[in-house]
């Protein structure tokens, strides 16, 4: 994962705790949707840590900012994309398998936001991905 070392045991513990505190259930009692939410919250925690570091770096540098306005954004599903961007997809897949969970079944629980209906939405998403990849 970016900046934050991936700890498989910590990840598994966090997923179990999220199921427990969000739904008052054990992992074995949780539905696939609840497990998806618990995994998403765990990934969100890592993203937030990295986001805060980025924000502090931007405040120090005072860089130029680009704004892109679009009524459509076809970003697709976020969980798998975020795991890939964090460089942790394989490790998370392995951790989930150790918990008896299939990452593909978990990813299938996420609805596609479909914020648009065509080329402009896909173009907006490509612009965002490209700028992020180029560290803008």
Residue ranges of model-derived segments:
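A conserved ligand/cofactor-binding region detector
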Residues: 1-136
């Amino acid at each position: 994962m970016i900046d934050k070392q991936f700890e498989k045991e910590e990840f598994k513990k966090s997923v179990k705790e999220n199921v427990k505190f969000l739904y008052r259930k054990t992992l074995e009692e949780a539905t696939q949707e609840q497990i998806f939410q618990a995994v998403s919250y765990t990934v969100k925690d890592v993203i937030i840590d990295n986001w805060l570091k980025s924000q502090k770096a931007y405040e120090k540098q005072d860089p130029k900012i680009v704004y892109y306005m679009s009524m459509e954004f076809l970003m697709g599903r976020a969980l798998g994309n975020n795991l890939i961007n964090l460089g942790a997809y394989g490790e998370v897949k392995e951790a989930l398998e150790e918990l008896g969970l299939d990452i593909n079944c978990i990813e299938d629980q996420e609805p596609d936001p479909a914020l648009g209906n065509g080329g402009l939405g896909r173009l907006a998403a490509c612009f965002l991905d490209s700028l992020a990849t180029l560290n803008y």
